[in-house]
Amino acid sequence: MKSSGIGGQAVLEGVMMRHKNDIAVAVRKPDGNIEVGRQKTVSPKEKCKVLGWPVIRGVAAFISSLIIGIKTLSFSASFYMDEEEAKKENKKNEGAMMFGAVAFSLVLGVGIFILLPFWGAEGLMKLLGSESAVLRAVIEGVLKLGIFIGYVSLISLMKDIKRTYMYHGAEHKCISCIESGRELVPDNVMDSSKEHRRCGTSFIFFVLFISIIFFIFLRFDSLLIRLAVRLALVPVIAGISFEFIQWTGNSNTVIAGILSKPGLWIQALTTKEPTRDMVEVAIAAVEGVFDWRAYLREQGIEVSGQAAGPEEQ
């Protein structure tokens, strides 16, 4: 079926969904009710035409998604703060906080997933007494993958993170339900797949895979130059990875299916089977940005008048 064009992420006790310039965050509040917050956004390419060019648009989309993700996480967390904490948060400079959060996320990501594997690979190459660029690139890629798998597995032991992974599964199931031509009702969603080709976890796989290919061919004797090149190519690799995930996520070809598989396997680490009440929250988020009934009718599928989920609180 035609791609719905919706995507999202899990937040604290909820789900954020985005379709074009519409964003909705649905959160299960402590009192059990579902709160849905909506907002409009402007895509990077609408702000500047250059940001819509291939590869460049991937970098812009990544940064934009990071900012939106932090904002929606803050929104969901606000329901679980006590009154005094909420007042303190409201008094803070939102712009400065956002800049700090994004900067910290980028620095942490570079440190853990670029610098650590780089130095680890250099150390192993010395132990092996090898100068092979191919071996170095493969070792570095394996270390990156190992660190990522270890990281997501370790934090999944935390109760809140485990529940977030379950909401992540609910988000995926909603998209799978719609794109498989089924009505967005809890029973259908629960029976749907939690695999989603356009997921950010699959994006990470493409980043790892493409970086290995790049660094097999980019060979420099200087250790500092090798490190500088890796840092400089982060945006380029991210941009190319974005193009790949857009293609595999919207293509039904055999090749796209094969290339998607490793990302879907890794996805199993960051998505867990949700409960029915989590699915209800995800449905509320979808309905905040997307008319799934109209989408199904466009595909020639008859839609009943059955309610899709709980009433918005």
Q: Where would I find each of the regions flagged by the language model?
A:
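Short, charged, low-complexity patches
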Residues: 48-59, 233, 237, 275, ...
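Multi-pass alpha-helical transmembrane bundle typical of ion/small-solute transporters
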Residues: 41, 49, 59-62, 66-85, ...
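Divalent-cation
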Residues: 1-74, 78-81
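Juxtamembrane "helix exit" motif at the C-terminal ends of alpha-helical transmembrane segments
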Residues: 75-79, 106-129, 207-231, 235-238, ...
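Hydrophobic alpha-helical membrane-embedded segments
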Residues: 22, 53-72, 140-165, 237-250
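Polar-ligand-bearing catalytic/cofactor-coordination segments
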Residues: 2-11, 15-17, 31, 88, ...
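Transmembrane alpha-helical segments and their cytosolic interface motifs
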Residues: 94-111, 193-217
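Hydrophobic alpha-helical segments characteristic of transmembrane helices
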Residues: 79, 83-128, 132, 136-157
